[in-house]
């Protein structure tokens, strides 16, 4: 089963990805992880990517495709995979389709987890972490027993810079701008499933299982 996971920041992507790969016994292919692995291992592809990153430039689509398809050629992907962070552009999606078609394969389902902007802002800006032990809380979903104080060690809870309103709004805007053309592309292909991401983590996963089958 070849899957793509589209999920905005704050919508529980990590949790759903972990549940999907465990249930369906397929590898989780995260673009970020592949890039880091190639760079760490000093591969030719990693060196090329590092040059662009060092220069503060975006890694070109062609190189992203090369790095992703190199990973998809590994043996553990022969019975399926869950793609996360790839494709990011229509060009990448088209190249992925060509790559899979050449192997007599295709993308079976694109899981689009949808959460409205207001809910995402609450989720992202409500996160608090302990300044000492790193324990994680949320002012709405997992509040500490005492406001602003860590349940674990009693230290002060802080809001990370990444979780402030401006950064959160920017992350959501970038995701929406990047993902809309992809959603349109897969709508035309007829292989996308839209999932309401506001129903709770377990309900979202049960919906995914209902779509993919047991």
Predicted features along the sequence, with ranges:
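Glycine-rich phosphate-binding loop of ATP-dependent small-molecule kinases
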Residues: 1-214
């Amino acid at each position: 089963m070849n899957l793509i996971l589209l999920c905005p920041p704050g919508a529980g992507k990590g949790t759903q990805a972990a549940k999907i790969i465990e249930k369906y016994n397929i590898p989780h292919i995260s673009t970020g992880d592949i890039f880091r692995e190639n760079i760490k291992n000093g591969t030719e592809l990693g060196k090329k990517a590092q040059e662009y990153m060092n220069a503060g430039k975006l890694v070109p689509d062609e190189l992203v495709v090369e790095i992703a398809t190199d990973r998809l050629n590994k043996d553990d992907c022969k019975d399926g995979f869950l793609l996360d962070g790839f494709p990011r552009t229509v060009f990448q999606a088209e190249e992925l389709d060509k790559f899979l078609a050449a192997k007599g394969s295709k993308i079976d389902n694109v899981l689009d987890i949808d959460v409205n902007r207001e809910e995402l802002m609450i989720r992202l800006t409500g996160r608090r972490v302990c300044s000492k032990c790193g324990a994680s809380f949320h002012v709405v979903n997992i509040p500490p027993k005492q406001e602003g104080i860590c349940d674990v060690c009693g230290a002060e809870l802080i809001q990370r810079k990444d979780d402030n309103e401006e950064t959160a709004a920017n992350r959501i805007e970038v995701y929406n701008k990047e993902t809309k053309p992809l959603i349109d592309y897969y709508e035309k292909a007829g292989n996308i499933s839209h999932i309401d991401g506001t129903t709770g983590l377990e309900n979202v996963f049960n919906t995914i299982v209902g779509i993919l089958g047991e």
